[in-house]
């Protein structure tokens, strides 16, 4: 398996759009919809490839922090992971971790933190991945409950 930073050409765009359509069909995240080109443009893109084809991706970009003083000083540059996806048949094999670590190494000259939000329905698995395997720190949670009528 190889991880590489990719440019957003037509081939890469087609791969990312296809993966996001598959992800939306899984119905594993609240509110997730397939990406359009405008959702991806301007992001740094990292691809995981095996056997000549893509099996996962991570994309995001660097921002200056705003209203995040509880974890970093105002204006601190951080890399916001917008999406991290691995095809279902290749999950739990370390690909997501390798994508994350590769991106972290690639952006460390311009960012001081890696930050992400998740809307997954399987929060136990995602917390295990991000907190236990990637050694991230829990920052906040937004929970909901439908009011029964």
Q: Model features per residue range: what roles?
A:
Residues 1-16:
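A short beta-loop-alpha structural element at the N-terminal edge
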Residues 21-49:
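Active-site rim helix/loop that mediates acceptor-substrate recognition in acyltransferases
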Residues 47, 53-62, 80, 85:
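Conserved beta-strand in the GNAT
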Residues 59-79:
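Conserved acyl-donor/pantetheine-binding loop and adjacent beta-alpha core of acyl/acetyltransferases
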Residues 72-88, 141:
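Conserved acetyl-CoA binding element of GNAT-fold acetyltransferases
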Residues 86, 92-105:
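Conserved acetyl-CoA-binding loop-helix of GNAT-fold acetyltransferases
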Residues 97, 120-140:
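Conserved active-site alpha-helix within GNAT-family acetyltransferase domains
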Residues 107-119:
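Conserved GNAT acetyl-CoA-binding A-motif
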